[in-house]
Curated annotation (Swiss-Prot):
Gene assigned in the entry: moaA
Complex formation: Monomer and homodimer.
Pathway: Cofactor biosynthesis; molybdopterin biosynthesis
Role: Catalyzes the cyclization of GTP to (8S)-3',8-cyclo-7,8-dihydroguanosine 5'-triphosphate.
Gene Ontology biological-process entries: Mo-molybdopterin cofactor biosynthetic process
Annotated protein name in UniProt: GTP 3',8-cyclase
Gene3D superfamilies: Aldolase class I (3.20.20.70)
Binding-site list for GTP: 15, 65, 96, 157, 259-261
Enzyme class: lyase
């Protein structure tokens, strides 16, 4: 079964947030004091999240990414992931994490059926990492990556949000990681999650990122897979790994968008930058799975052709990336 939106795009990818809480305070994601924590009763139970995931797979979703906040801070996450991994028809279960809890949890996550990890890492320099995350320790993340490798995970995808004057001087350092390691590094254009002034000054366009790398290395394009995300992928000639750029600001990828999102409060969103949301809670009050499936079809049916953000403007309401799931 295929899930097709009104613009002919095949939707096969669900980003499912399990919590708004995080053990970091990254500057591009939330204010220094953090975000107001949602009440326990506002967060969907694991049972309801499982029902949403199962309904999504039933109508054509093949890949589920578990996000937060930081998903690993929610108690009971490992048994929940094992249930998701066992859903018949699901091809990929992946998880995005900041890596801080991987030293203790990587082996259990692998045993639960998580197939791959995306790790948010914005600097390889301890002082810069602390400045961006405000409270994070770089070595913990590096230890987490090592623990994931020891647990048998494939090489991770490392996500770097590039910010001019903050960490853009490390683009070449991150690119070099892929030469000897079969990992993937994705450079993400800085995107405004709030109505901040002069955010454009922080954005390094994807073209500039690639030009910086190309100044030292020859890049070859890499073909994308069926459930791939929005990055344009390349390989340094002869390298073991790959790199990519995600250009939400300078060159939207809406024509190839294959995803929907569900927040930890049960709001379904067909676009990260859309102000529209669809509350799934009323459809969780019945035990009839068809009703929930039709609700998910409805949000796909109103998926916009493209978002309203560009390098000149950001036509969306302020939001917390931690609450919406990225």
């Amino acid at each position: 079964m295929e899930l097709i939106d009104s613009f002919g795009r095949r939707i096969n990818y669900l980003r499912l947030s399990v919590t708004d809480r995080c053990n970091l305070r990254c500057s591009y994601c939330m204010p220094a004091e953090g975000v107001e924590k949602l009440a326990h009763g506002d967060i969907l139970s694991y049972e309801d999240l499982f029902r949403i995931a199962r309904a999504a797979v039933a109508i054509g979703i093949e890949k589920i990414r578990i996000t937060g906040g930081e998903p690993l801070v929610r108690k009971g996450i490992v048994p929940f992931l094992a249930r998701i991994a066992a859903i018949e028809g699901l091809r990929q279960l992946v998880l995005t994490t900041n890596g801080l809890l991987l030293p203790e949890m990587a082996a259990d996550l692998r045993s639960a059926g998580v197939q791959r990890l995306n790790i948010s890492l914005d600097s390889l320099r301890a002082d810069t990492f602390r400045a961006i995350t405000r409270i994070g320790e770089l070595q913990r993340v590096l230890d987490g990556i090592a623990a994931a490798d020891a647990a048998g995970f494939p090489p991770p995808k490392i996500n770097m949000v590039v910010m001019r004057g903050v960490n853009d001087g490390e683009v070449a350092d991150f690119a070099r990681l892929t030469i000897d390691r079969p990992c993937t590094v994705r450079f993400i254009e800085y995107m405004p999650a709030t109505r901040e002034n002069n955010w454009q000054s922080l954005t390094v366009p994807g073209r500039e990122i690639l030009d910086r790398i190309s100044a030292s290395y020859e890049l070859e394009p890499v073909e994308k897979g069926a459930c791939a995300g929005p990055s344009r992928d390349f390989r340094i000639r002869g390298a073991a790994g790959t790199l990519g750029v995600i250009t939400a600001v300078s060159g939207h990828f809406c024509g190839d968008c294959n995803r929907v999102r569900v927040t930890s409060t049960g709001m379904a969103k067909s676009c990260l930058f859309s102000d529209e949301g669809f509350d799934l809670r009323p459809f969780l009050e019945t035990s009839d799975p068809i009703i929930l499936q039709e609700a998910l079809r409805r949000i796909v049916g109103v998926k916009p052709e493209r978002h309203g953000m560009s390098a000149c403007k950001a036509e969306h309401q302020a939001f917390s990336m931690a609450k919406i799931g990225g």
